[in-house]
C-alpha cells in the first residue's frame, strides 16, 4: 500500500508520469491481493533497516509495472522515488499493525467481552466461594467474577485504542535520516492522507521524523500493549482451568466444553484445551515483547537497525491474540456450563461465611462456630441455622454478603 500511494503522490507532484504512476499502483495492488507472493524470497533476518525487503518490493513492482506500461520502469528512480528504506519500511510496519489491530484484534476483543458480559448477567445471583491465595475467602457471585474478566478485556481494548494514534504516525517523507532529502515538500502528509482514505484509519505524517526513524518507541509501546492483553487473557484462561478442575478431585464448579479426548491412555478424560492454548499464546506474546524490547536497544544515532524483527514480532502478537481471543470466545466462553449446586455447597461449607457474623456475635464466637462445625462434621450453614444466629435463611444471607453496600 505504501508503494501504491507513494506512486500516486509522485504522479500528482510530477515526479513520475501519470501513466507510470498508474502502472506502479496496479502492480502494487496486485501484490496487496496476494499475487506474486513467490517473488519475495528475502528472509526477515536481514539488514536492520529492511532495505533487502524494500528493494525486493521495488524490483518486483518495477518488473510488473514495466509489463503493464510497455516501457522500462526503474526500481529506484521510479518505484522508490521520494522514499528511502529508512522511512518506507517502518511506515509499512506501522500501517500493517494499525490495520490489523483495527480489523482483527479489536473486533475480536469486543465479541469476547460481550460473551463475558452475557455470562456474567446470567449468573448475577449464582453464589460461590471467592478464593484468595487459593484459600476460601468470602462469598461472591459467579457473575461478579466473570464481570471482572469482562472489564479486563474492555480495558485491553481501551489500551489499544489509546496508543493507536502514536502508532499511526508514519515516518514516510523523512527519507534517509529524517531531513526529507529528495522528497518534495508535503510528500509524507499526502501519502498519509491517501493511506487513511484507503484503510479508513487515521494515519498522519510523523510530527518529528528524526524521532520516528531513529527510535521505534511507538512499535515497542504497541508490543507492550499486546503483552498486557496477553496477560489479561492468560489470567482468564488460568481461572477457567482451575474452576473447571477435577471434576471429582478438583473444584469442578464449571464445565468447559469438551473439544477432544484429553488423553491417549485415560478413557473419558477431558482437558481444558482452549484455556491452555490461550496460555501458550500468552507465553509467546510475552516473548515477542522481550524481542521488541531488545530490538529497541539497536536504535543508534539516526536509525533503528532492528526493524524487520520488530515488525515481525508485533504482527505475530496481533495475529496470535486475535486468533486466541476468537477461539476462547466461540469454543469456550459461550459453551460454559455452571454447576450452581456445587458452587452453593462449597460456599456453605466454607468457614469464611462467618465473617459476616463476626460484627454481631464477635470474632471469638465466630471462630468457635467454625471449630464446632468441624467437630460435628456439619457445614457451617447447617450449624448457623441450628443455632439461629443468622438473621435470614442461609441462601439469602450468602447472597447478601456479596453485596454488603446494598
Stretch-by-stretch model annotation:
Residues 1-406:
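Conserved, well-structured ligand/cofactor-binding cores
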Amino acid at each position: 500500500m505504501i508503494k501504491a500511494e507513494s506512486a500516486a503522490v509522485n504522479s500528482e507532484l510530477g515526479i513520475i508520469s501519470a501513466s507510470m504512476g498508474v502502472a506502479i499502483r496496479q502492480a502494487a495492488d496486485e501484490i496487496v491481493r496476494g499475487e506474486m507472493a513467490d517473488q519475495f524470497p528475502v528472509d526477515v533476518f536481514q539488514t536492520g533497516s529492511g532495505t533487502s525487503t524494500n528493494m525486493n518490493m521495488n524490483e518486483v513492482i518495477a518488473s510488473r509495472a514495466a509489463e503493464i506500461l510497455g516501457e522500462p520502469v526503474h526500481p529506484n528512480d521510479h518505484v522508490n522515488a521520494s522514499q528511502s528504506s529508512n522511512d518506507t519500511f517502518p511506515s509499512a510496519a506501522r500501517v500493517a499493525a494499525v490495520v490489523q489491530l483495527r480489523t482483527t484484534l479489536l473486533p475480536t476483543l469486543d465479541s469476547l467481552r460481550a460473551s463475558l458480559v452475557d455470562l456474567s448477567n446470567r449468573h448475577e445471583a449464582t453464589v460461590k466461594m471467592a478464593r484468595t491465595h487459593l484459600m476460601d475467602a468470602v462469598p461472591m457471585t459467579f457473575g461478579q467474577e466473570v464481570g471482572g474478566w469482562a472489564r479486563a478485556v474492555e480495558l485491553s481494548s481501551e489500551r489499544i485504542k489509546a496508543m493507536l494514534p502514536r502508532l499511526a504516525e508514519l515516518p514516510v517523507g523523512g527519507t534517509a535520516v529524517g531531513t526529507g532529502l529528495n522528497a518534495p515538500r508535503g510528500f509524507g502528509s499526502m501519502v498519509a492522507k491517501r493511506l487513511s482514505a484507503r484503510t479508513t484509519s487515521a494515519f498522519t505524517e510523523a510530527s518529528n521524523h528524526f524521532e520516528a526513524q531513529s527510535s521505534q518507541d511507538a512499535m515497542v509501546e504497541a508490543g507492550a500493549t499486546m503483552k498486557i492483553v496477553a496477560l489479561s487473557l492468560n489470567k482468564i484462561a488460568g481461572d477457567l482451568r482451575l474452576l473447571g478442575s477435577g471434576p471429582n478431585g478438583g473444584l469442578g464448579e464449571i464445565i468447559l466444553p469438551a473439544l477432544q479426548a484429553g488423553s491417549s491412555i485415560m478413557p473419558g478424560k477431558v482437558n481444558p484445551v482452549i484455556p491452555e492454548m490461550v496460555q501458550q499464546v500468552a507465553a509467546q506474546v510475552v516473548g515477542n515483547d522481550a524481542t521488541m524490547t531488545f530490538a529497541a536497544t539497536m536504535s543508534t544515532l539516526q536509525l533503528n537497525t532492528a526493524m524487520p524483527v520488530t515488525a515481525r514480532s508485533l504482527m505475530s502478537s496481533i495475529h496470535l491474540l486475535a486468533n486466541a481471543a476468537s477461539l476462547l470466545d466461540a469454543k469456550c466462553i459461550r459453551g460454559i456450563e455452571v454447576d450452581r449446586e456445587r458452587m452453593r455447597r462449597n460456599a456453605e461449607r466454607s468457614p469464611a461465611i462467618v465473617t459476616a457474623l463476626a460484627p454481631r456475635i464477635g470474632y471469638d464466637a465466630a471462630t468457635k462456630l467454625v471449630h464446632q462445625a468441624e467437630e460435628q462434621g456439619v457445614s457451617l450453614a447447617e450449624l448457623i441455622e441450628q443455632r439461629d444466629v443468622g438473621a435470614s435463611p442461609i441462601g439469602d444471607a450468602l447472597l447478601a454478603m456479596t453485596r454488603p453496600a446494598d
